[in-house]
Amino acid sequence: MNPIVVVHGGGAGPISKDRKERVHQGMVRAATVGYGILREGGSAVDAVEGAVVALEDDPEFNAGCGSVLNTNGEVEMDASIMDGKDLSAGAVSAVQCIANPIKLARLVMEKTPHCFLTDQGAAQFAAAMGVPEIPGEKLVTERNKKRLEKEKHEKGAQKTDCQKNLGTVGAVALDCKGNVAYATSTGGIVNKMVGRVGDSPCLGAGGYADNDIGAVSTTGHGESILKVNLARLTLFHIEQGKTVEEAADLSLGYMKSRVKGLGGLIVVSKTGDWVAKWTSTSMPWAAAKDGKLHFGIDPDDTTITDLP
């Protein structure tokens, strides 16, 4: 089985020209990290975790150190990870003061009998596991302070659009043993209510992985994704004989028509077919397979290069 990793950097509005190159570099870095793990014989779970950690560590993306701020000006992060081999999974929500929520989600998967920990319980577990705590203000960037100020101003003027300031990072992978996995991480929505939890940590919505079908990681308007169970819906269509591209189009189309939700997703099937699809304006993504790196941000704009 030829290994593959696909990553995304969130589906939302247009990305400014001054950010595109930095976003490009971040996506390539994450895909290269994930693929490097697979090429050395690592598992799909290792690969998706490694790729997402790279994105959480990049302030260009809405996860980890680039997370957007809630209405109190604080960072609250959500993340989940799933192993398609045995459907084991781990998730955390509303976590603060840690650099990499996806690592904590994996600890939930491997070190507890549970699938999901939140808020204070997740924080207590992180401390028990020796996860380093960092000051919350270290996760707050000037860019996200300005985004929060702008959102509050526009909300006061009743000009806000709940689907414009979105962002998530995610990865799916297929390893040489035929195992699939997904990982998804986010800071949520700008100016969200304290305690708001979106789709990213929710199995079946923010992602899903099953060796019998494939793996999906989603992005977009979290409430809409939750309502249609976007990740599992996409895998359902694959179960019914649809190609990965057809399945992605069907599920995203249903979310748009049924609840007017915009978003995107990445998919890898158990046979190694993959796709990146979105209905939002843009979605940075990258895929690494067979020594080639595929990358795009806007529709009909894909580049293919050799991997180092």
From Swiss-Prot:
Consequence of changing T168 to A/C: Abolishes activation by autocleavage. Abolishes enzyme activity
Top-level EC class as recorded in UniProt: hydrolase
Entries under SUPFAM superfamilies matching the protein: N-terminal nucleophile aminohydrolases (Ntn hydrolases) (SSF56235)
GO cellular component: cytoplasm; cytosol; nucleus; photoreceptor inner segment
EC number: 3.4.19.5, 3.5.1.1
Function: Has both L-asparaginase and beta-aspartyl peptidase activity. May be involved in the production of L-aspartate, which can act as an excitatory neurotransmitter in some brain regions. Is highly active with L-Asp beta-methyl ester. Besides, has catalytic activity toward beta-aspartyl dipeptides and their methyl esters, including beta-L-Asp-L-Phe, beta-L-Asp-L-Phe methyl ester (aspartame), beta-L-Asp-L-Ala, beta-L-Asp-L-Leu and beta-L-Asp-L-Lys. Does not have aspartylglucosaminidase activity and is inactive toward GlcNAc-L-Asn. Likewise, has no activity toward glutamine.
Protein name, entry field: Isoaspartyl peptidase/L-asparaginase
Organism, as annotated: Homo sapiens (Human)
Highest classification ranks of the organism: Eukaryota, Metazoa, Chordata, Craniata, Vertebrata
